[in-house]
Amino acid sequence: MSPLYKLEVIDRVMFARYPNPPSKQDVTAVLQLMQQHRERVGKPLLYVGMIDSKSKIPNAEERNLLSHLLSEGRNFCEVAHLVIEGSELQNSLQRVIISGMIIVTRTYDGFLSVHKNVDSVAADLQKRLGKDPAPIIRKARELGLAT
């Protein structure tokens, strides 16, 4: 695992925490792990990508890599939740811009949603898992994957 991200699958929820935008090698590794865990679990994963509040804004190349990750991740994941942590203007703008891009590119098909914190993901996880996700989120917090 790269020191530039942390990743763990709890139940069938894949948590990935990025303190900075992932590199090409990171994206390749995450996609390989998605495939491996998808095969191990036997069902599509529920992806929760956590973007640290102090993460730098991705440049054009990094945005393309993130787009590739989400596009290819559809092969292994039922849904992708992108949590952009923080209350600063930069964090709010990132959430608004990504939400706007989903609409502009007409990819608003329910696969990707943008959140401010991991707690706002809980209702969807509960629906998809058919059980209370609180222990899963608690474990992710204990592992430093969520705040």
Residue ranges and their predicted role:
Residues 2-147:
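Amphipathic, Lys/Arg-enriched alpha-helical "gate/interface" segment within cytosolic domains
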